[in-house]
Amino acid sequence: MFKRIDHVAVHVSDLDRSVKFYERHFGFKHYFQHSAGNGLQIAYLKLGDTVLELTHHPGETMAGFHFCLETDDFNGTVEKLQHDGVKLIRAPHDTAAREPRENGWRRVVFGGPDGEQIELRG
């Protein structure tokens, strides 16, 4: 039986730039990188138990992707990302609870270097 999502993969156009972006702005730690053949390069980053796999394959593009990170300091995190110049896609707003045990929560969406959308909730 399934237990959890093991990792999320994002295809990027510049692996080094994207590794630095996720380390600097979101606190991910780059822990492994390798070539998988045919020019495919893969970098793995961790944030707690969450694994982000960044892939780069020359000539391929990515479209229509987002993932969500939870933060315990929503306003402070949003302020820091805006101060650092990370592109704001959708301003902070309230959203409904998606599960009975939850209250509503705040969300915001920022843009990554290749157009991926990074949602924050808190």
Give residue ranges: language-model regions.
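A general structural signal for stabilizing positions within well-ordered secondary structure
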Residues: 22, 58-59, 99, 109
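Conserved short beta-strand elements that form part of the metal-binding/catalytic scaffold
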Residues: 31-63, 111, 117-122
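Short, flexible active-site-adjacent loop segments at beta-strand->alpha-helix junctions, enriched
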Residues: 49-51, 58, 73, 92-94, ...
